[in-house]
Amino acid sequence: MREIYISDGYTNSVKDKCKYWLQTGDTSVFTEEELNTIRVFVQVDQSGAEALIVAYDCIAGDYRKLFIHGIKPHVYVGLKLFADKWYQEAIDARLTITEDDILRLSMTKIEDLKKNPAWTDTKNLIASSDNWPSSRRYYYHAKQTCHSANYGIEASTFIMNILEKSAGKVVLSREQGEYFLNTYRALFPEIVERCQRIEEQAKKYRMLYNMFGFPYTITSYEVTKNIYKELYAWGAQSTVAEITRIAYSRMQEFIEAEKKKWDILADTHDSYLLQCPLLDVKECSTKAKEFMNQRLVSPIDNTEFNMKSECNIGFNWSPFKKEVNEVGLQEIQW
């Protein structure tokens, strides 16, 4: 069993108090000494991260619209890939979604999806499929398609990646793998164009740039298919990593300037982890998100946009799970 890190001052003797506080924000249950000694973890993750960067590194199209209108790509792609499944799944889940609802949603423009009364139940149904048996993990299939197709993966590698990531539980046929990837690329041809553009730039100039303007020099003797995936991914991955580095540095400067009793504990590519006193959690959360939500500019059309982020707090560095880890990292509702 792997070690789970806990925040300073937390012990099982205060578990019930901490659980209550996470639910309510009420600190009156703690003694003055506990308020001074117990720390809480604050973790801020980039929301969208590489996918958002890819959207603004593409010609403006439907992929970018997903982020503008707050539609999760995995859900949208799940709707499109498995449009023939959702009506029966809705019946089994005892939802009032009709076959006509599914048909209309699958044909609706991205900017109009939220106007359809059936959208909320449908998107929740799609997302919930991530926890279904492997043959019906439609959300998982869509998620892996999004992650892989953005970087030019081929069907055989895609099928093997899913098999490995699911520990052998999700097995796709060649036909399914090709269908998923071809459907995705038909939905978002701007992503195909981006890959082609990166190939051409790499061959012509042997240098790429991320959204902060920092270069990547290609030192391979030849720019061949073997390194295409690395080239497609570099701009988004390095931009995401640099956003976190900048946020980390700005937070440390703020802590020192304001003499805050906060500690930065981890930098994990697209997120960072802090701990702070219970009474500081809202200020710490707000600042941590502020530093992460940086302004960026599309190199394609100079459109300005912000990285988005989400914050979770808890008393150990592991996700919340009901009846298993109820003081784990979770979004606060107060």
Language-model-derived ranges and their functions:
Residues 1-334:
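Conserved catalytic core of nucleotide polymerization and phosphodiester-bond processing enzymes
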